[in-house]
């Protein structure tokens, strides 16, 4: 297990610190994300998001995506698919300059691969591209991936509560 500390914040997020870097995770009901009534403004416009929901056969589905413009448009553009999205988990950084387009694409690709490996979910992500990243960015992301995966697993568990007030 990876060593990290978790702090619950009043800003509807959890802060995860490891190796001197801090990240934010938000869990937002998809209905609030769609309506824009979630009250969340991430510090960084670069985000990786994970949508959780059920398809028409009641199977668990996940979608991994990225946005270079925050959370207002891209995560909500999946409402017309054949999945009833229930939750959106947002990953971003406290430092608005730490994440960039290549890093979030790399993290997106790694998360998609991890979902495929579990075989527990229907992965509705068509394809991802971790290409275009440089060795320095990859190294930063590789250091963070073990606890990113652990935190996603914990906060995506139904009933997990980290002082949400929606």
What does each of the following model-derived ranges do?
Residues 1-46, 54-60, 69-166:
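Boundary/linker segments flanking structured domains
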Residues 63-65:
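Conserved catalytic cores of phosphodiester-cleaving nucleases, focusing on short active-site segments
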